[in-house]
């Protein structure tokens, strides 16, 4: 039966099945505990940074994979320790944060020192690419640690879940509207399949989900609508 489907239907089926598996993993990690959520983010961080550095190497750059990934892990650990309500490592969150900050302050100079001995043709490019991986991948994922405690000082998984729902609503509506109604391309040179119709469809889906989140969580509607727009 699958051979009789059009390419669009096959693509939709693959996206649906993979999305369902991803949804189970992500939602399960968020609902299980703060630590499982942190482990999921950390796995995404390491995988994302290694992929980023791999792509950078294909473009002729020479990032410091080990130091860059280590800096990203430490940055994540700093933020997770700061928001965690039951961390006991090194005597508590404040001690863990201080220790991680000291380690982070050592890692950054270490990148510059190591670059002196790597004998690369463009050391500035190597350092810049390494730091870009930290800023582009590790920093956003580290800041996601704060989302479940927005509006309170306790772990509230449903805040994170609805934040994820907003992202998914944007992706799903953008894909469906773009696939069925997409006519005007946004940036054909960079992404030939992205259309303005899909963009506004995704925006509408995100805003609708933001409104639902505000009602379910009994939170500020305008705050969630603003979050959805961003």
Where are these regions (language model features)?
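Membrane-embedded alpha-helical bundles of polytopic integral membrane proteins
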Residues: 2-228
